[in-house]
Each structure stands twice: as structure tokens, then as C-alpha cells.
């Protein structure tokens, strides 16, 4: 049986890590794309040369042409630039919007049936722009944010309680930024909700609040430590979980930036919510009940995303015609 073909658009730190994980998990053959000549070719060759040691038979190739993505069943997009000192939000949006338009056109032409996962920041705005630019069905285009943010939340909770990360479940909703909403009441340890663990004396509400804040600033914490870059191992692993659920029709319930058109009272926006990912893409949006502070926090997060999308519409109004 032919292996699935996975296109990686962007061959930086996340792109390289994605390629290696795809090989290790035998998810399919990999085509790494980048505009920088030699970079995708060199990285794909380096990873391919690890295959005899690791024992995987996935084929890897590097390219500077979108044509090589033809027939890809999954495309994971990391292309774009990070925000640099002195760069305004609109500067970053303007640059990465152009990238999304180019990437969207390439996917539309050569991989129109692909399941597309966007990682480029600012995430919620870029995945919205990518879907508009590609013209792909909204259920086939998602943003990777919630899996990563929830993983960070789970890790911090497991560390706090000194238990296995496997026994911790958690959901982080909303935009991918400091307005994200870690849902304490829907987070559990072996099925026991966090509020109950506070009552049992396992921790205090003050510690939970600190962990929530650390989760919101999880990406910034790593940037501050690295000084010359940002996270790439955990973001790549998070995107792989999404791709694997699609390729293997696992129907996992994962928090992703998904297109909402009425769900949660949100229209024509990508916002982080729980979804079921299977062979058809986003097969269901899990519209959990939000009330009180959680609803207020979610609405604030949606408003922050709306601000980014509105800025995109002003910078690239032609996207609205697609």
C-alpha cells in the first residue's frame, strides 16, 4: 500500500522536527519545502540518513517548488517570520499575510484535497487567512495552538501533583496568546477535577492560578530562556498528534483553532475549541458549556482574535473576495 505524502511548508526548527517525528512514527513520506535554496534539501537528507539507525523507511525529499507537494494528503505550514524587536503587530501581520497568500495558492493548485495544519503566528489570524487564500473547505484547515497550550498546562499540573502526565487531562481554549483560556473545571487528574483536588488539599487555588498564568506565558518563557529563538519540539509534537488523528482516522478530541460559524456564538473566525479530528478533517465541534468567568475570559479572547482578523482585512482586503 502506498504511503501517505506529507508536505511541510517551512523548513526551520519546527519543520525539521516535524520531518523527524513523521519518519519515526512512519506516518508517511515527507516533502520539505522552503524558499531558502539548500535548506530543505539538506535537512531532509540529514534526517533520511538517520533512518537506517532508527529503522524507518519513510522517504524524505527537499524542494523549493510547490509543485513537489502535488498529491499531499497533509500539509503542515510553519512558513513565515517571527516578530522581531521594533516590529509592530501590523508589520508582522503584513509580512506573514503575504506568505499565507503564497502558501495558500500553492496548496490550492497542487494539494487541494489536503488536510492543512497551520502553525505560523499570529496563529488565529494566519489560519483564517490561509483558509481564505487556499479556498479549501474550512473543516480541512485548522490551526495548531490548543494542543500545545493544553500540553503545557498538563505538564505543569503533573509536575505540581507529582503524577504521570498520562493521568492529567486539560483543555485550553480561545486564542493562541496571553488571552488563552485554561479551563480549570474541565481539567482532571485520573478523572478528579482540579477544584476537587484543591478541596482535598492536594494544592491551593493560588497555586492553580500561578500554573494558569505560567501556561498563558509558556511560549514567552521559552523565548526568554533561549534568547535566540522559540519553542519547536513541543509545537511539532502537537501538530503531529493532529496529523496522526487525521491520517489514521483516530477521531481524537483535540483543542484546535477551528472555523466557527455560530458555534460558541462566534462567526467567521478561527478560535481554539475542542474538535474531533478524523479522516474527514474536523468532524465535530464540541460545544461545551461556558459560564461565569470562563465565558467572560473566552469572550475576551475572541475579541482579541477579532482584532487581529480585522487588521488582516484592512491589510489584505482581497482575501474577503475568495
Curated annotation (Swiss-Prot):
One of its GO terms (biological process) is tricarboxylic acid cycle. NAD(+) binds at residues 10-15, 34, 96, 119-121. It is an enzyme of class 1 (oxidoreductase). Transmembrane segments: none annotated. The keyword Protein biosynthesis does not apply. It catalyses: (S)-malate + NAD(+) = oxaloacetate + NADH + H(+). The keyword Oxidoreductase applies. The active site is at residue 176. Keywords: NAD, Oxidoreductase, Tricarboxylic acid cycle. Its EC number is 1.1.1.37. Substrate binds at residues 83, 89, 121, 152. InterPro entries: L-lactate/malate_DH, Lactate/malate_DH_C, Lactate/malate_DH_N, Lactate_DH/Glyco_Ohase_4_C, Malate_DH_type3, NAD(P)-bd_dom_sf. GO terms for molecular function: L-lactate dehydrogenase activity; L-malate dehydrogenase (NAD+) activity. HAMAP family: Malate_dehydrog_3. Catalyzes the reversible oxidation of malate to oxaloacetate. Belongs to the LDH/MDH superfamily. MDH type 3 family. This is Malate dehydrogenase. The lineage of its organism: Bacteria, Pseudomonadati, Pseudomonadota, Alphaproteobacteria, Hyphomicrobiales. The gene is mdh.
